[in-house]
Amino acid sequence: SLLQFETLIMKVAKKSGMVWYSNYGCYCGWGGQGRPQDATDRCCFVHDCCYGKVTGCDPKMDVYSFSEENGDIVCGGDDPCKKEICECDRAAAICFRDNLNTYNDKKYWAFGAKNCPQEESEPC
């Protein structure tokens, strides 16, 4: 679920997903089109693609299980679809953490769809 995604971002990247990633670049936030603008935006692009491959459950609403082991997030549970959602969220949170040094809110916060032409969109 989106609430769990927020939790994973807080645990892994030590940032609020709602504050830092809800309206950034062309792909961080609702929807997405155009070309990812930087490494952080590419994290969101890859996350969107990952959600797009999930079938049989709702990535934004369905609750999955995870645990922390030695500082790492481990996705669990018996439902393969929900586990896949967790893996998408986990990978994005790690990507955000690993690319904090390229995050540029002055340039890409509230970037807007007008700066992300549909015809420049990349396939997943």
Curated annotation (Swiss-Prot):
Main location: secreted
Cofactor remark from the record: Binds 1 Ca(2+) ion.
Tissue expression: Expressed by the venom gland.
Cofactor: Ca(2+)
Enzyme Commission designation: 3.1.1.4
Subcellular location: Secreted
Disulfide bonds: C26-C116, C28-C44, C43-C95, C49-C124, C50-C88, C57-C81, C75-C86
A GO term, aspect molecular function: calcium-dependent phospholipase A2 activity
Binding positions for Ca(2+) per the UniProt entry: Y27, G29, G31, D48
Cellular component GO terms, alphabetical: extracellular region
Catalytic residues as annotated in Swiss-Prot or TrEMBL: H47, D89
InterPro entries: PLipase_A2, PLipase_A2_Asp_AS, PLipase_A2_dom, PLipase_A2_dom_sf, PLipase_A2_His_AS
Keyword annotations from UniProtKB, A to Z: Calcium, Disulfide bond, Hydrolase, Lipid degradation, Lipid metabolism, Metal-binding, Secreted
UniProt cross-references to CDD domains, sorted A to Z: PLA2c
Catalytic activity: a 1,2-diacyl-sn-glycero-3-phosphocholine + H2O = a 1-acyl-sn-glycero-3-phosphocholine + a fatty acid + H(+)
Signal peptide: none
Pfam families: Phospholip_A2_1 (PF00068)
One of the GO BP terms on file: phospholipid metabolic process
Family: Belongs to the phospholipase A2 family. Group II subfamily. D49 sub-subfamily.
Function according to Swiss-Prot or TrEMBL: PLA2 catalyzes the calcium-dependent hydrolysis of the 2-acyl groups in 3-sn-phosphoglycerides.
Designated name of the protein: Acidic phospholipase A2 A
Protein's organism: Gloydius halys (Chinese water mocassin)
Lineage: Eukaryota, Metazoa, Chordata, Craniata, Vertebrata
